[in-house]
A protein has these predicted regions:
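Structured surface interface patches that mediate subunit assembly and partner/cofactor docking
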Residues: 43-55, 81-83, 90, 102-211
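Active-site-adjacent scaffolding segments
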Residues: 2-111
Length: 211
């Protein structure tokens, strides 16, 4: 993800992203906040047992985000304050690389606390594999030729999304298509809708609007 952002030309930061109401620069600012959250959480140990795991972390909404949330609006203002794309690139690389090192050093079994919930560090970091993979797809949604997420990340994110839904996508679907359709980032084609229909109750489970 950091590499994909670092390679973007400046003009791409003003283009729309796959997140409602956000340009690429706003999404990159959100990724910086995410990386800071990882750093803070990994050094916030908990004394009580985990209350959630990588699957139950997610709240599934009935409608897609609109971009009108106050925190979303704050992110837009913060992104604008950077003014120059290189500053966003620098800050993401700086904080993101630190978060990556912290993740590598963390004991997966360590109990950590965030948002008034307790997780193992391993489960908490698994949450971010899904989140950042989806946001990588958001980043390149309108940027043909931009670097795609690693295959390993796509496969892991798909598996996690299927666990959240309690159902699997058609095996003929690519991981990218499963993630985009499964989270409502794009509508299924007629052929995809037909495949979903052949799987019984599966269509009723998707899309999942994760929050």
């Amino acid at each position: 993800m950091r590499t994909a952002v670092a390679e973007l030309p400046d003009e791409d930061f003003a283009r729309p992203s796959g997140c409602a109401g956000w340009r690429v620069r706003d999404l990159v600012c959100h990724l910086i906040i995410d990386a800071q959250d990882v750093l803070i959480t990994l050094v916030t140990p908990a004394e009580t047992e985990p209350t959630r795991n990588a699957v139950t972390y997610w709240e599934v909404a009935e409608t897609p985000p609109t971009g009108d949330d106050p925190l979303d609006a704050l992110t837009v203002r913060m992104a604008a304050a950077y003014e120059e794309p290189w500053l966003l690139k620098f800050h993401l690389d700086d904080v993101g690389s630190a978060a990556g090192r912290a993740a590598e050093l963390a004991d997966p079994g360590l109990w950590v606390s965030t948002r008034d919930e307790v997780f193992t560090a391993g489960d908490y970091l698994s949450v971010y594999v899904l989140e950042w993979t989806l946001h990588h797809l958001d980043l390149i949604a309108h940027l043909p030729g931009a670097a795609e997420p690693p295959a390993e990340s796509l496969a892991g994110a798909r598996e996690m999304l299927e666990r959240i839904a309690g159902a699997a996508f058609p095996t003929s679907w690519s991981d990218t298509d499963a993630l985009l359709v499964g989270t409502g980032r794009r509508a299924p084609t007629d052929a995809e809708r037909a495949e979903l229909g052949e799987l019984g109750e599966l269509p009723a489970k998707f899309p999942l609007f994760l929050g």
